[in-house]
């Protein structure tokens, strides 16, 4: 009789839904370690704007793939995927439970679905041309260009995510093949349980606004200024993301702090809506109401089912 495959638990959900607190409870209950699945937590020095788990939280449970590179270093999806699979194997070898936690849907899908990611080196000259086109013609025109050559990728990529649109165009330019065809699926040898935390939208928005207000009290603007003064420019992928780009008009004297904060709240609401589209497509997904106080007990009931029973390996 073939031995069951080891179990991977994934915790997903929109920003501010409560993933961090729940993941710490679950990891402690299951003798687990956490693998961060967040494209922004890899950057050192970007702590407040990314809502990075605090040093105290990281001391409670070991976390992997946090503070991996400096904000000006490139960290591709392929690099992340390889590092995450290595972290999962390391956790399993210690007879502990790997728990994937994060809100970057593309990264989570790449792990759980086993994407075969094309190794295409960046063409910075080509990227600059596309960026210039986006600036002059608008992001919708660039997305329409992708729609023509790769409708499947265009459907999956938000038109406002110019960086991802450009990457898809770049891959087609360099290989002559659509990125959607190159991203083949080779599911990893794990059993998967995906826990999707949800809250009513009005409550989630209120929590987002409270989080942004907390970030301001913790010194988010000072963190952004420190990064700029260290030479990390606004054009970097790390600095053009949520929580940082909103303060560029303040730095340039074009908007007040209050206007930038309002924009950050608005952008985070929009981001939270988009996250759900990724999570709904993930394998073996179970929706959980994050308001319930017995979440841990609910998950332990799921884990009591034979198909979800944790199995540790020592290979």
UniProtKB/Swiss-Prot annotation:
ATP binds at residues 13-20. GO terms for biological process: tRNA modification. Its EC number is 2.5.1.75. SUPFAM superfamilies: P-loop containing nucleoside triphosphate hydrolases. It comes from the Bacteria. GO terms for molecular function: ATP binding; tRNA dimethylallyltransferase activity. It catalyses: adenosine(37) in tRNA + dimethylallyl diphosphate = N(6)-dimethylallyladenosine(37) in tRNA + diphosphate. Substrate binds at residues 15-20. Keywords: ATP-binding, Magnesium, Nucleotide-binding, Transferase, tRNA processing. Its cofactor is Mg(2+). Signal peptide: none annotated. Catalyzes the transfer of a dimethylallyl group onto the adenine at position 37 in tRNAs that read codons beginning with uridine, leading to the formation of N6-(dimethylallyl)adenosine (i(6)A). Belongs to the IPP transferase family. Monomer. This is tRNA dimethylallyltransferase. It comes from Herpetosiphon aurantiacus (strain ATCC 23779 / DSM 785 / 114-95). The lineage of its organism: Bacteria, Bacillati, Chloroflexota, Chloroflexia, Herpetosiphonales.
